[in-house]
Amino acid sequence: MAPAADRPGYWGRPTSTLDWCEDNYAVSFHIAEFWNTVSNLIMILPPIYGAIQTIKDGLEIRYVFAYLGLTAVGIGSWCFHMTLQYKMQLLDELPMIYSCCVFVYCLYECFKPKNSINYFPIVVLLLFSVSVTVVYLQWKEPIFHQVMYGTLVACLVLRSVFIVTWVYPWLRPLSYTSLTVFMMGFLLWNIDNIFCDTLREARQKLPPVVGAVTQFHAWWHILTGLGSYLHILFSLHTRTTYLKHRPKVKFICGVWPVIRVEPPKKN
């Protein structure tokens, strides 16, 4: 990871426990990590559209929370990378836990009656979220957050594999695409961390536009944001299929995937 900021900036000296590989205040005096900030748009705008469409289609409120949870992560991450302040770091990292808990609930409760509420997993996930929050506020160790987040992601992967193996195998392309895109982001996140010094040296020699492409933490945002969005589509497709709706994946302008859900056919 990068050392502390070597340029003065609007938000002052970083107070966060993490400072990523992008040079601080290299592009804008008002944004500490420019590319790591603007790359969060993929986690902010598309999920807002998804939440609105979910409401229009009259679907369960849990999926509105799922979409808005991803938006909350994007907004928090924007604030964190823009400022590199500790409070904004928490605004990024804690919603990652909370939103992933919503994802877990949606996916593990997708084969239940419509509008059913299972309070047991809600209580378990709530206790998990509170416990992680309390421990992380006292023990400011990023690896703890990363392990807890990874645990939730592992739960989602296992459940997804079960669904596409034993229940709806035709959803494998959507599920595996989501997982592959997410893991590509995770790979670049690790490269950015491990080879930070090499990347920073290379950027000094490359044209600015080319150097921007090597901002692998920004690519982590883009790919994991897309992977998480596709996971919501997979979860929603699974749920609405079980409820006898007629979900279809369509592409806005032939590029961006969305779910269109038609009501069950009337006999």
Give the predicted meaning of each segment.
Residues 2-267:
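Multi-pass alpha-helical transmembrane bundles in non-GPCR membrane proteins
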